[in-house]
Amino acid sequence: MSELYDILVETPPTKVILLALDQGLRDCERSLAELSALCEANHMEAVAQVTQKRQTPETGIVLGSGKLEEASLAAETLGAECAVFDGELTGSQIRNISNALGGLEVIDRTMLILEIFRSRAVTNEGKLQTELALLRYRLPRLQGMGEALSRQGGGGGGGGGARRGAGETKLELDRRHVHARIDALAEKLAEMEKRRGESRKARAKTGMPVVSLVGYTNVGKSSLMNALCGPSVAEADMLFATLDPTSRKLILPSGMAVLLVDTVGFVSRLPHNLVEAFKSTLEEAAWSDVIIRVADAGDEQREEQLAVTDEVLDGLDCADIPRLTVYNKCDKPGAMSFDPDILLTSAKTGYGLDTLLAKLDEVLSDRVHTLKVLLPYDKLGLAAPMRERGSVQVEEYREDGLYLEGIVKTEDLHCFEGYLV
């Protein structure tokens, strides 16, 4: 009975304290609020915050020794088992801060996000991408550990040198192992990216325009997809609930079929290693005909969150793709927008979904076109854009040439000038 009770009772979250250096470069209060939410997503509870305003970090420990004493006392008093730093630390900084806190475990913001991704990864590709990001994060920290081994082994005499040599040998083995694993993961992911590219080509041949939902994590992208297409995608009120892109067919009011893609959510200062590891997944947005930027209508930081979304998109060569902006969760108190170009929706109540679908129809009407063409037999190569990036719906070999009816993208219209029927 007690074993069953243990299974049914949820393990309480790990208590942590948050540490931050406020250099006046960003809103420290908002950043810590987001860090607290990230902790919650990793089954942690932030029980205290210790911040320090200073222009330059303290050498080796980032915060001043007095602040770290304050943090150590808070951790001991409140029973915190870990300190989470709002930023990225080097291996030596993590070690020095941990020593100053009496041996308390220390992680940084990057490690926290990577751990969340690791726990959320479901598909094989997602797991490999996360492992790659984790290894790239840890590799330079192995080097920091090597410096510590050198200092420890430098006490003098042949014995010290022997200890240092043994330590450095183990470090080199660790480095080689990590480098080899990184290379192996990169090779596997490159093969998966090749297959993803083949899937994109197959998808393009259907002629269905692609619409991607992008935005900050936990703004309701999956809920919006389910509201538009019918329940299928897993929903959860948590950060990074979706790591792998999910595609669903959506019929617009005009009868046009489109492919709606739900993508991984963003967060401010998304770790570079994570962006690199998930680049092939994030690049789904770059193959879209329309991008829907989704924000939480009730979140005061929605404009900042959209700015983060645009920053990531700009790095993925999406500048020329039309974008719609949607404030989802408009049923929440305080949700509003005075901008006529912003669409208000509620995946929960269905409000605004018809308007969103009509707007998609309007935008896509400028992106795809239905054509009837007759190509002379010495010009059959001109059919390639319709076959590869659009769709062929009717194909007839006639006496005077090849007759085609189908869908083409706007950028391919010029290929058929002079051959329209």
Segments from the language model and where they lie:
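Conserved C-terminal guanine-recognition region of P-loop GTPase G domains, centered on the G4
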Residues: Y5, R30-E40, S72-T77, G87-L104, ...
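Short alpha-helix plus adjacent loop in nuclease-associated cores
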Residues: M111-T130
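C-terminal-of-GTPase-core extension/linker across diverse P-loop GTPases
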Residues: M1-I17, P140-V219, M225-N226, G230, ...
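N-terminal accessory targeting/assembly segments
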Residues: M1-L114
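Conserved beta-strand segments of the P-loop GTPase G domain that flank and frequently precede/overlap
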Residues: L18-D22, Q49-Q52, V84-D86, I292-D296, ...
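Switch I (effector-binding) loop of TRAFAC-class P-loop GTPase G-domains
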Residues: S2-L4, R196, A202-P209, A227-L259, ...
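Conserved nucleotide-binding/hydrolysis micro-motifs of P-loop NTPases
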Residues: D22-R26, R54-T56, E88-G91, M111-L114, ...
